[in-house]
Amino acid sequence: MKLKQLFAITAIASALVLTGCKEDKKPEAAAAPLKIKVGVMSGPEHQVAEIAAKVAKEKYGLDVQFVEFNDYALPNEAVSKGDLDANAMQHKPYLDEDAKAKNLNNLVIVGNTFVYPLAGYSKKIKNVNELQDGAKVVVPNDPTNRGRALILLEKQGLIKLKDANNLLSTVLDIVENPKKLNITEVDTSVAARALDDVDLAVVNNTYAGQVGLNAQDDGVFVEDKDSPYVNIIVSRTDNKDSKAVQDFIKSYQTEEVYQEAQKHFKDGVVKGW
């Protein structure tokens, strides 16, 4: 082989190699946007959470998608199954009972939000002393809010419980009822809507807000601010340390979110962090 031919072959081979390198070098794909899907209760709490989503987008580039629920039956199952990444709609006593009843062993508390005090509402009385003998009173029927409501009634001097510290008390634990109040358990989601038919309803802020009631403005009596029922953010053991979950927690625990909560609940909301 002549020297000129050898140089020509070498040059062609080099060109092919360089061309191949150029073709293989592709632009890097843009990183997928950080996303999180969070379950919330409909009403004012959802509106408060939307501010957390705004903070998350501005500070961390996190896209937050909320899924609304009208009751507490499904949000924990949705997180456990992976349909949601997290939820922000309950307190620890409720989570403990729900997880135990449904065997949701992969749920974990990752942060606190607010304490939303429980309150007693009425269209017939302005003061608890106006409650007549045999008056109709409704309390939530889910285990934790039921006990919470009964403890609140005891603090108003209306009843006495077997154990005032038992968060899972039921109407069967009432040992004194001097006014012979007719205390009935109803579904948590309908307690506030029963006000036309009863003398007093003990309702949590989620459902009170859905019918336009505010604990401080409309409550006959309100739970103390030192309540142990701080609301929480819940995720799973497999995603609790993920950037999306941690950034959402930081976004929720901000002054912007607290200010929005005060707009909706006034003095009826207390920081839990």
Swiss-Prot record:
Please report which positions carry a covalently bound lipid of kind S-diacylglycerol cysteine. Answer: 21
Name where it mostly resides: membrane
Membrane topology, as annotated, equals:
Lipid-anchor
Q: Set out the biological process GO terms recorded for this chain's protein.
A: D-methionine transmembrane transport; methionine import across plasma membrane
The listed locations are: Cell outer membrane
Query: What does the UniProt record say this protein does?
Result: This protein is a component of a D-methionine permease, a binding protein-dependent, ATP-driven transport system.
State the family it belongs to.
Answer: Belongs to the NlpA lipoprotein family.
Pfam families for the chain = Lipoprotein_9
Q: Which InterPro entries match?
A: Lipoprotein_NlpA (IPR004872)
Would you indicate the residue range of the signal peptide?
1-20
Keyword check for Lipoprotein, yes or no.
yes
Q: What is this protein called?
A: Probable D-methionine-binding lipoprotein MetQ
Q: Where is the lipid attached (N-palmitoyl cysteine)?
A: 21
Keywords assigned = Amino-acid transport, Cell outer membrane, Lipoprotein, Membrane, Palmitate, Signal, Transport
Q: Which PANTHER family match?
A: D-METHIONINE-BINDING LIPOPROTEIN METQ, D-METHIONINE-BINDING LIPOPROTEIN METQ-RELATED
Gene Ontology terms: cellular component? cell outer membrane; plasma membrane
